[in-house]
């Protein structure tokens, strides 16, 4: 038996395949999902999620969101996401620099909060590429 896993961002479906295991960056730490997992609905942090299927592990950087697990179906809704293998190292470094500049120049509390989230995502992308 396997999990029916879907990872969806506002602009695209990132993953829609079966898997044996999913590891997610939840608000309370890393969360592992296997078949027959209890029903669950929880918030996600920005970070790297991993999916294991018959061909091995796949890593996806996600920018926050939610996960719903029920009856071996895993629905992951994220604000943004991309495969780690598709991230260019030099572009990721530039994105961190740009996000840091935006964060440092933000003045209003809402601007600062949004800039902090984008900085966290840029840093997660860079770390994922460096660590792979």
From Swiss-Prot:
It is found in: Plastid, Cyanelle thylakoid membrane. One of its GO terms (molecular function) is proton-transporting ATP synthase activity, rotational mechanism. InterPro entries: ATP_synth_F1_dsu/esu, ATP_synth_F1_dsu/esu_N, ATPsynth_dsu/esu_N. Coiled coil: none annotated. It is a peripheral membrane protein. Its main location: plastid. Keywords: ATP synthesis, CF(1), Cyanelle, Hydrogen ion transport, Ion transport, Membrane, Plastid, Thylakoid, Transport. Belongs to the ATPase epsilon chain family. Produces ATP from ADP in the presence of a proton gradient across the membrane. F-type ATPases have 2 components, CF(1) - the catalytic core - and CF(0) - the membrane proton channel. CF(1) has five subunits: alpha(3), beta(3), gamma(1), delta(1), epsilon(1). CF(0) has three main subunits: a, b and c. This is ATP synthase epsilon chain, cyanelle. It comes from Cyanophora paradoxa. The gene is atpE.
